[in-house]
């Protein structure tokens, strides 16, 4: 005999589909929640993969086929190193390179950052064919070696609006040097131009210096052995294109993982919405499901039927989410150029890299979230007693068989929060947050019973009934307020985290911006190598009327590890470090005869530079590293890979570098800022400099700009808070509606006992007030616990900085009050729909 086919497929068509059509808006909301979660997570993945792919391609086009790249750990190195490297028997080809990031101005005034690469076209051709200029028609071949000739890639030509034969200006300090566009290069990525190496050194002021040497080794030569034989001078390190890509991937990993987790939060709340929608659906179809059970549909088939409904919601939401995520990623790549708002891929314009495997994986996450959300309603349908349910007496919500689960999950969440990160990602902290959320929700029935037991018993009949039902049927509260607890706790946690971060950044800005006015050379990038205001201009500024004090600041990059990104080295007059730096912890006394430095928190985590330790600084190629003493740690929210502050006198003595990137100016009380700015521009013009390249900013402007960027970066969290609260309230509405509809006989009996409609409605509203009030209280407490993990664990492990925990009680109070009012109103609306003649007549159904 052949086994009978399962009736689930037929029931999906004739039983489930009409329900879906009849309540299309309700189910569409669940589909929308899954859609949003999948779309956000998939778009973050696409943006990052596309940006990384484009960055890798750009690195390969610049580095070409080189096996090794030699560069200075800080600044450049003497070109005298090149001949010895080129003559080594294991080196087949050695190409010297000068590379400077600067500002370019097109013929029509367009400004854009430009990477200028100087190389020897005859030597570099086999190594980096993408960087070899293709001269425009009519140009003499000798223009390849002309001092003031440059060839631009497509990105540079587009941004500057130039063609062959046009003239552009590039910035060198506060001077503008004219260059003629003579050809093109096919290299992709950010805007760049290629010059003959001698011309680049002359124009950009790097005579006698090289940025790097690209090496092609002979067949069979091993990189490690060649490096050992070369005996490179101190401060010169080796690198490869793959290592550069891996460094950027490592730096951006924490940022993109956090964005992905935020996106999965939407999926988490979407699962609760599916749970609430299907709970309502099962409650409304309780008698129909019972009839199907009497007619032969097994408990297992009822379980499968509801799970198939949840999977259908997840599948539709996932398919639409993948399409929406693709559109979001495409739009973001056009508007943000793959930057993700974190500044990790500056200057590149990636194309969308769509992956069917990634689409399948993220779509599967959406289906899985929906199925998990439908599991409890499916179990309720499976455990339905058909005989009782046909009479409307079935209870779809039973007491938990595992009362210990909630406390165990909470304890597990606390334990996981104490574990270190995994490969730089706070994996255990994320699992801790998940355990805290699930454990808190599992504790809802017990917490409701405990809180109601502690509350005084009301005397009036209606409040007494509302109070007693909430206490005695508290296991139904898990369904009624689980959405409120989940969504409110997430919203509270995000609110506290963002408020803590914003408050800490504001306090940090107050310390690091003590001057009245700041000046710098104009550029699209704050770290451009050619941005040098010059020591002479600084001396002139100190004599400008209205300037009481002028301090020059030098910012440069320093490589301390091949696997980690470069750290920022800040040289400035320090004086009393405890007053000029936002220190964290105690400041150790300086050691006589040793250079003192002050490191950011990231330096402690990434490089082990704790106070009292000695850190080797390769400040000058060809000289031994400086053994610097770490006096203290300071808070820095601007440089995720770490920063070091060194006194300017020590820096200039050790490096001979007199350059200045920024000026900090303290003005006299009677001085007018516009007059001081004009006087500084005149001083620059008197030295033959381009005064228009100087930009000024007051601390207020810098603070406003920084906080505006901060708010824009966290816009997605504000949006997720709104989504979470909306989904939670919708789930509460669905749960209350399900319970009220299942209690029509109870309301009818109360009416027969003499309760008026208003009193019965008051009972329903009272239950809603009690349950949502308790839900808000639990959500607030759980959210504060989660926020502690986010602030004290996730942020330090992800970005290597700490912040002060700040709870905005006014906003949190309004948030909880709004949830309680909305939940109570929802219960009243649901009660009005269930109370009436139908409720009175429902009592006769058993007679």
Tell where the protein language model's regions lie, with residue ranges.
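Interfacial "coupling" helices/loops that link adjacent transmembrane helices in transporter permeases
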Residues: 21-23, 272-314, 393, 718, ...
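Small-residue transmembrane helix packing/gating motifs
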Residues: 62, 144, 184-219, 512, ...
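Small-residue-rich transmembrane alpha-helices
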Residues: 276-278, 312-344, 357-383, 409-422, ...
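Peri-transmembrane interface segments
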Residues: 55, 230-268, 283, 292, ...
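Hydrophobic, regular-secondary-structure patches
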Residues: 26-115, 140-143, 158, 224-228, ...
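Alpha-helical transmembrane segments
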Residues: 26-27, 38-64, 256, 279, ...
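Alpha-helical transmembrane segments, especially those used as permease/efflux helices
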Residues: 1-5, 9-10, 17, 21-29, ...
